[in-house]
Amino acid sequence: MRSSMFFAVCAAAALQTALSSPIHPRHAHQSFPNTEQWPIATVGKALKQQLPDEELQGILSQVSQDNIEATIRKLASFGTRHTLSSQTDPARGIGAARTWLTEQFQEAADASEGRMTVDWNSFVKYPGDNERIIFPVNITNIVTTLKGSEDPDRLYVTGGHYDSRNSNPIDYQGDAPGAVDVSNSCYTNWVWEDASGVAVSLELARIFAKYQPKTTIVFTAFAGEEQGLLGAENLAQTYKNNSVNVAGMINLDMVGNSKAEDGTSDPYNIRLFCQGTPLTENSTTTTSRLSIGGDNDSPARNLGRHIYEVASNAFTEMTVRLIYRLDRYSRGGDHRPFLEAGYTGVRFVQPNEDYTQQHQNVTVRNGKQYGDLVEWLDFEYNTRAAKVVASTMWSLANAPGEPMNVGINTTTSDNFSQFKWTAPKGLPVEGYEIVYRETLEPHWTSVIEVGDVNWYNLTSATIHKDNVIFGVRSVGKGGYRSPAVLPFPFGCTRNC
């Protein structure tokens, strides 16, 4: 009996040792290299993030926390900014907010020596299939355009929405906090959803007005967001109907608070939501994209990677965290109508959310304050977010356009990767770069400088097209780079 127990214990111990060991006992005497990067980069060099040049550093140094806070507090003072609220009251409602914002954008434009203009993009929305529109209402976007000096026909749009709502999406008569009946309150002054984004748009318009970007930048304040992204939809369709080249839309919606509902603080990160397969992509292109594993390299996600490279640094004191989603669960934002119009759009959002402060009546329940109030804001965080957006917009607006017709030859199966592309229109290109990364990496890790050519033959068998994701990007004056473009296969006859 003792002998049986002894052998059972020994067997169990041996089994446990075998299960816990990552190396089979027969090979325990052997060793093997464990490389962190695979495939081993034998071509090119490690890719480094782009730091701001002296001019951009000067822009970042001008971003004012005081200005951002003052804008938010002023927007809060209008009580409700509901899309259906008064448009004639000089002190309360969306009309008063619109008038004040227009004046502020115009004041910025006055310092631009004629380069910046302020316009209204207005339309009337009637009741019908939208249950949040209960009577005809004029909806007005404030559109502030800073014309580019060399390639004015390429636009980059940024901004947030200045309308607001509370728990009841059709309550448009709520007064400002302080006149609130706790038992029956439906009032809000809505500060970071989305006064925080509008404040950034206005602050950057003030600063950029004194500079001359090479391409056009549009600073917006959208209305009708809370009724179904109506303002952004109208502006996106207006651009589309007029064949305007919107090269990128950067939505700023909820960028003013670093704390979560449980008090967790994350003050140095900002989320960037990036859609995968384009919403308007045709089935043939999508099939090709999926066949090469390119669903993670949509224009939106490569724009996101570009933003990470130019805006995550010690000058912004922030790290951009890409989120591979169109938006948060069950939520939407003003970048979506641009995506639906065939443009590239992404959305900045603070790292954590407190749902007691979103779309809530301003009230106290069980000793806890609800509502979107000024005291919840982290103005230092909001200011750092503004620097991230400033770095993004300036870097995009001074870079060449993305290379066009980017392809990779798949005529035959071999160890070579032959790329071709055509030059973008507009700003001159000084050269091109091929970037690559392991398929599971979120960001580009390596870069090959190929010069001012329109093709390149990569002869390295270790950096095989089956094992990495490639991108091609333009490089312009001062080292400003475009977002990378995924090469699609050409010359293949099946499975592509």
Swiss-Prot record:
Residues 1-20 form the signal peptide. Residues 402-496 form the Fibronectin type-III domain. Coiled coil: none annotated. The keyword Lipid biosynthesis does not apply. The keyword Secreted applies. It comes from the Eukaryota. Binds 2 Zn(2+) ions per subunit. This is Probable zinc metalloprotease SNOG_06590. It comes from Phaeosphaeria nodorum (strain SN15 / ATCC MYA-4574 / FGSC 10173).
